[in-house]
Structure formats: C-alpha cells, structure tokens
Regions:
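Bacterial signal peptide processing site
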Residues: 36-38
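N-terminal secretory signal peptides that target proteins for export/translocation
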Residues: 1-17
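Conserved hydrophobic/amphipathic alpha-helical signal-anchor segments
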Residues: 50-75, 150-199
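Extracellular/periplasmic head regions of type IV pilus-like filament subunits
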Residues: 115, 184-279, 283-286, 290, ...
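Short beta-strand edge/turn micro-motifs at domain boundaries
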Residues: 119-163, 167-170, 295-299
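C-terminal soluble interaction/assembly domains
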Residues: 271-319, 323-326
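C-terminal motif of bacterial Sec signal peptides marking the signal peptidase cleavage site
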Residues: 31-34
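Surface-exposed, charged secondary-structure patches
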Residues: 82-130, 233-240, 245-252, 258-267
C-alpha cells in the first residue's frame, strides 16, 4: 500500500534524500549554484529588522535564538514578513527543528561568500546551507535577506517534491502490478481508475475493511487526482505538490510502438501514469510519466502544464521527454 505523511516544509532542516541515487545528489548540489546565479534580491533590510556588524555576530545571534526558542528574536532578525518562512505554526515541530539546527550549528559552522558578496551559513558535518543568505546594506551592516531566502525555499521545495514524485511514480507502477495479481470481475486486469466504486475493488484505492485485502494505494494519492476532485472535493489535495493521472494508450515513441492498453473493455495490455505539479514553478517544474516497463521520463511542459497534463491519456516519450537515470 502506497501512502506517505506530508510534512510542512521548514527552513531549519535539510530536505531528505530519497532512493534515487545520483539524481538526488544532483538536485541537492544545485542549491548553492542557484543562489549564486540569481544575485541579490534586495538591498536594504526591512524597517525594524535586526542588523549585524559581521557574519559571525549574525551566526551567534541566530543559534542563540534557536537554542532558546526565542520566536520574537527570530522575527526581528528575519523581518516582519518572515512569520510563515521561519515558523510552521506547529509548536512541537518548530521546537524540534530549532533544536536540530542548533545541534548542527554546534557540530560545525562556517560562512561561505557568494559571487555577489552575500554570505551563506553552512552548518553540520554535511555543510547544509541555511536558505536565507546574509547581505550587506548601504551602511555596511549585515542583514538576513529573507526575500532571497523565500526564493531559495521555493527552489528547495520544488526539488524535494520532484524527488518524492519520482518515488511515487515507481510505487504507482508497483501498485498496478499488485492490482493485476488479484482477480477483478473474474479476470486479471489493470485498474483504469484510482478510486473504487462503493463496495467494490475496481480502482487502486478502496476503504480498508477487516478481513479484506488492503488497496494498493492510500487515500492521499487516490484523491490527488481529477477523479478525486469529482468524488470528494474536501479530500482533493496535491501529494507532495503533485497530481496524478492514468494513461491508457502508448504512442509510437514508446517501447513496442502504438498500442491501446485496453482490449474488449479491459485494460490488460499495459498501463501508464502521469505526475504533474499542482502549481507550475511553485510546487514543481517537471512532469513525469511511467508505464509498465518502469522507466520514468520527465519534461518541463511550461506554464501550460496545469492546463494540458490533466488531459493526458497517452504514454509517448518522444524526443522532448528525457529519461530519468537512477
């Protein structure tokens, strides 16, 4: 059964590396270069925002506030518009995250200068980059550039969502194979929908009942679909920033050529899935497709992603799609 818990993104912890090897490392390695290329986001601190005489002073103030859980001090350091950036609103999680950051800072910390003169704080033995850089204002004082930090957080969240959805694509494939091993309506077949009809097991998800097999996927993924929006709008939410669809045909560029996965009203000749960002450029950039062969392809479909991807029905990785290497 495929299901995960969605965790609020926090600036105090590094994004988790998932099981896609070098691809994960490449994405994480892009974090600092992204900062360097974009350059400074603003030139002056917000009114009332704390400034510092040196990066070292800023680092000391930051870790002291983290150790003490001093939210007011943190808000003063990052500016009046930083509430939703530095804190999640979950008191227990914020406390744990701050403590984890303080521990990492205590193990190792140093500042790295970026090309445009800003400084980024690296903490812990893995040199995790704190997402909000330090910048000099016109008077020579240092301040945390929260605007640039927001951009960096968006980039990191996109990277984490994309890594997570590479995993989801693989797990959806496994879910269909698992579904196929069970008899449905007297024959083996792949599911053509995510959510089963009431009292049936004709989709990849059905409510759990004592003494009956569990569905191959959980409700979070099942309702992160256009089908889920129709069934129960209150449960329709993106999973790790993405929505999903089932592909019922493969095109000329797929292995084996053009083929309808359905024969005589039953889908037993293959299957495919598409995973696309709920908000292009905010929750994700790449759209992913996979079929029964287990190879994931990706494509940047641009600003029209959310208009086109929900209507995709064909697995057809032509030259505009790139194979994702593990």
């Amino acid at each position: 059964m495929v299901s995960k818990t969605i965790r609020h993104f926090t600036i105090w912890q590094p994004a988790p590396v998932r099981s896609w090897g070098a691809w994960a490392l490449v994405l994480l390695a892009l974090v600092l270069p992204a900062c360097r290329k974009k350059g400074p986001a603003g030139s002056e601190p917000a009114r009332g925002q704390t400034t510092f005489t040196s990066p070292e002073d800023a680092g000391k103030a930051l870790v002291d506030a983290a150790k003490n859980g001093n939210q007011q001090q943190l808000l003063a350091m990052f500016g009046p518009d930083s509430q939703g950036v530095i804190l999640t609103g979950n008191a227990a999680q914020d406390k744990a995250s701050l403590a984890q950051f303080a521990e990492a800072f205590g193990r190792m910390n140093r500042w790295r200068q970026l090309e445009h003169g800003s400084q980024v704080l690296l903490v812990g033995v893995s040199n995790t980059a704190f997402p909000i850089p330090l910048k000099k204002d016109s008077s020579g004082e240092w301040f945390f550039d929260t605007k640039a930090g927001k951009n960096e957080l968006t980039n990191r969240e996109i990277g984490r969502n994309e890594l997570a959805n590479l995993d989801v694509c693989g797990m959806l494939r496994i879910a269909e194979l698992e579904y196929f091993e069970q008899s449905h309506d007297g024959e083996k077949q792949y599911a053509t929908k995510f959510i089963s009809d009431p009292g049936k097991q004709n989709g990849l998800y059905w409510p759990e009942e004592p003494g009956k097999p569990k569905s191959p996927i959980g409700p979070q993924i099942a309702y992160a679909t256009t089908e889920g929006a129709r069934r129960q709008a209150s449960l329709h939410k993106p999973f790790y920033g993405y929505y999903y669809g089932i592909l019922t045909i493969q095109g000329y560029y797929a292995s084996g050529g053009l083929r309808d996965y359905t024969r005589n009203g039953v889908m037993n000749r293959g299957f495919g899935f598409v995973a696309y960002p709920a908000k292009y450029g905010i929750t994700g950039v790449m759209t992913f497709i996979i079929n029964q062969d287990g190879i994931v392809f990706q494509k940047d479909m641009g600003a029209t992603t959310t208009e086109e991807a929900p209507f995709m029905r064909q697995f057809n990785p032509d030259g505009s799609w790139l194979e994702v290497k593990e």
